[in-house]
Amino acid sequence: MFRSKRSGLVRRLWRSRVVPDREEGSGGGGGVDEDGSLGSRAEPAPRAREGGGCSRSEVRSVAPRRPRDAVGPRGAAIAGRRRRTGGLPRPVSESGAGAGGSPLDVAEPGGPGWLPESDCETVTCCLFSERDAAGAPRDSGDPQARQSPEPEEGGGPRSREARSRLLLLEQELKTVTYSLLKRLKERSLDTLLEAVESRGGVPGGCVLVPRADLRLGGQPAPPQLLLGRLFRWPDLQHAVELKPLCGCHSFTAAADGPTVCCNPYHFSRLCGPESPPPPYSRLSPPDQYKPLDLSDSTLSYTETEATNSLITAPGEFSDASMSPDATKPSHWCSVAYWEHRTRVGRLYAVYDQAVSIFYDLPQGSGFCLGQLNLEQRSESVRRTRSKIGFGILLSKEPDGVWAYNRGEHPIFVNSPTLDAPGGRALVVRKVPPGYSIKVFDFERSGLLQHADAAHGPYDPHSVRISFAKGWGPCYSRQFITSCPCWLEILLNNHR
């Protein structure tokens, strides 16, 4: 029974992996992204289905599905006919068949020509000629058809060689993964399976394994790299791209320690330099994107006042946790939640090293934005709030403050330490799902103390994070107060 249960857990974990989705294509093309930019979308999370012409491959969960090759060319032809006509499957007359083999005879259920219905098939009525034309295979003269990444059935030697190579790589990945998972105890397998099936909603504890000399495709594959690529990021190449979250064993352990945590949801990918999307500045003169100044216009003053009201008048909001007479240890930051220009709820003081800020989380504690009520909310705010999901993990670490995007939609960050030194343009960084970014650098902040302040009110210890919507020169929203849902992180000066 013990061996049987462990084997079942290993098989469930293998079926829960994600693979690049090459069947749906890029899916995006033109159009405006949900963040308001004209650029390509960020790398989607395993459950995200947003399309977008992204350079990275979309990932999807592996679903138990009957492969096309399993029914043979005859079954594939019947399935293709059924998708085009929407009728019942009919037997295909073999070449050289007798007069009794009429193409109008319907196959009996369970017979040789019968193909059972599948929930994964798309049935289109033949009466709708437009849909039939859209679903029909394209002419060979179509350049997009020639660029199809999926080889046709029964292709030439090159396509068969590519398929055989993919099968060999898949088999090698399965062998290496099984060899690693079978080293884990039943409790560790349960923890790992819960984290994978909840998509990080229940990250669970550390899953420690000895540092093994695993190799995949002739390259070293540490446990955290192997499972991170298997369950979260199929395009992950090196372990240095991963950052352990605070509280994980690998966060405090030595880099060459005897054990390492392989829970993929105890790691995040580092957010490197990005190429910004095509700016909206080509539609407007660039002089509009100067730093805010009180003398610019009434709109500039309004936006500046809205985003700095908590700084200029901190005593306006009464919070017992922020009182200097409080006996609690000093908080290292306070979090304010805004919807456009309206602050919702009270300041949330953070005392722990890390805090979760979320809309809906299966397990855990922190700042729940879903419990903050407002009498009148616009439709854009409601839509954006529904995209917050697991939200972010904000942590204070020795080198600075980090934000980890736990949700399924990107977040957008602006911080004094992210701006270019001496630059006048507003820098807003896009953080895809599953990525982390250092939103505040303690070392760089010391240099900002002696730098000349920008025009207008300026707070060197304030970080702004917007959910799902970007702002600034590269987006249609020029100010943070135009974003439906955003956070203001007010860092305590006494660190």
From Swiss-Prot:
There is a cross-link at K174 (Glycyl lysine isopeptide (Lys-Gly) (interchain with G-Cter in ubiquitin)). The modification Omega-N-methylarginine is found at R74, R81. Residues 332-495 form the MH2 domain. Changing R74A: Strongly decreased methylation. Induction: By TGF-beta and BMP4. GO terms for biological process: aorta development; aortic valve morphogenesis; BMP signaling pathway; cardiac vascular smooth muscle cell development; cell-substrate adhesion; coronary vasculature development; coronary vasculature morphogenesis; fat cell differentiation. Keywords: Isopeptide bond, Metal-binding, Methylation, Nucleus, Phosphoprotein, Transcription, Transcription regulation, Ubl conjugation, Zinc. CDD domains: MH1_SMAD_6, MH2_SMAD_6. InterPro entries: Dwarfin, MAD_homology1_Dwarfin-type, MAD_homology_MH1, SMAD-like_dom_sf, SMAD_dom_Dwarfin-type, SMAD_FHA_dom_sf, SMAD_MH1_sf. Residues 1-115, 133-161 are annotated as: Disordered. Residues 149-276 form the MH1 domain. Zn(2+) binds at C206, C248, C261, H266. Residues 1-15 have a biased composition (Basic residues). It is found in: Nucleus. The modification Phosphoserine is found at S436. Ubiquitous in various organs, with higher levels in lung. The modification Dimethylated arginine is found at R74, R81. Disulfide bonds: none annotated. Transforming growth factor-beta superfamily receptors signaling occurs through the Smad family of intracellular mediators. SMAD6 is an inhibitory Smad (i-Smad) that negatively regulates signaling downstream of type I transforming growth factor-beta. Acts as a mediator of TGF-beta and BMP anti-inflammatory activities. Suppresses IL1R-TLR signaling through its direct interaction with PEL1, preventing NF-kappa-B activation, nuclear transport and NF-kappa-B-mediated expression of pro-inflammatory genes. This is Mothers against decapentaplegic homolog 6. It comes from Mus musculus (Mouse). The lineage of its organism: Eukaryota, Metazoa, Chordata, Craniata, Vertebrata. The gene is Smad6.
